[in-house]
A protein has these predicted regions:
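Flexible glycan-contacting loops in extracellular carbohydrate-active proteins
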Residues: 223-248
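Short tryptophan-centered beta-strand motifs in secreted/extracellular beta-sheet-rich domains
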Residues: 84, 132-134, 198-213
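Short strand-turn-strand beta-turns centered on an Asx-Gly dipeptide
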Residues: 214-218
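Ser/Thr-rich, Proline-interspersed low-complexity disordered segments
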Residues: 20-77
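Extracellular beta-strand elements of beta-rich domains used
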Residues: 84, 250-254
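Extracellular glycan-recognition surfaces and repeat-rich motifs
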Residues: 87-116
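Secretory/extracellular carbohydrate-interaction modules
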Residues: 112-176
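Short, aromatic/His-centered strand-loop micro-motif at the edge of beta-sheets
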Residues: 178-201
Length: 258
């Protein structure tokens, strides 16, 4: 009897000991799965004009600047005039660097991007020897912002460029196979009205390798370069800094020369 009582007593003590043990809280661990990271595929930016930040002067043997050259040229029949009413004649649209549009008898190039560059080439205007003049009217322009006339253009990497700055300078550039050079580097001229608003009449005579350049009926310079013999004509605008640049072109006249 006493032995049975002892066994029952020890059993109850064991149960009480187990009841006093701390509870173990087993939490379920979340399963972490790696989410793949999306890879951004870069969108290529269309290059509308070859970079020409660094200009290399032509070798002395191929460079000829003759400001005193005879500028009396006989013009025969007019090849065409453009009063900028037909949008089919020019490259127009909204581009990465700004807007090109026709309106009010003007072709307007508005650069909206820092150091942006816009240009427009006239369709089906392949010229070799000619006299051309066009009016340029900058409305937003400052400092070394540039605008001007392109000719003998056969590709984005082959043409001549008559460039005017908004602080009264000009230069003549040549791009050949994508490489830029300056037969006539930046030169100050009192014939170029600085700033905006202003207006200038830009003119070019091209006869073979001989080329002459004018602003407002004043002869600026002449160069001799046989590299590019023919091509289309066009206009351009370049922003030198972060500010917008807007230039409108009008009254384009192109003549044959004797």
């Amino acid at each position: 009897m006493n032995r049975t009582f002892l066994v029952i007593f020890l059993f109850h003590i064991s149960l009480a000991s187990v009841a006093c043990l701390p509870l173990i809280n087993v939490e379920s661990q979340p399963i972490v799965s790696e989410i793949p990271t999306a890879t951004n595929t870069p969108i290529p930016t269309k290059v509308w004009f070859p970079p020409t930040a660094t200009y290399t002067p032509l070798p002395a043997s191929s460079r000829l600047i003759t400001p005193t050259i005879e500028t009396n040229t006989n013009y025969s029949s007019k090849i065409f005039s453009d009063n900028f009413t037909d949008p089919k004649n020019w490259e127009l649209g909204t581009f990465a660097d700004g807007i090109i549009a026709i309106g009010n008898n003007e072709l307007t190039l508005a650069v909206k991007k820092e150091r942006g560059y816009l240009f427009s080439i006239r369709e089906q205007t392949n010229l070799s020897d000619f006299y051309a003049e066009i009016s340029a009217r900058p409305s937003i322009c400052r400092g070394e912002d540039e605008y001007g006339f392109l000719f003998r253009y056969s590709s984005p990497g082959d043409f001549y460029r008559f460039s005017i700055t908004c602080n009264g300078q000009y230069r003549i550039d040549r791009l050949f196979e994508g490489q830029a050079s300056s037969p006539q580097p930046f030169t100050i001229s009192g014939s170029i009205p600085p700033g905006a608003p202003s207006e200038s009449r830009i003119a070019v005579i091209a006869r073979g390798k001989e080329m002459q350049f004018f602003i407002n009926d004043e002869h600026l310079t002449s160069i001799s370069d046989p590299t590019l013999g023919n091509g289309n004509i066009g206009v351009f605008v370049r922003a030198a800094g972060e500010d917008d640049v807007t230039v409108s072109y009008s009254n384009l006249d192109v003549y044959e020369i004797d």
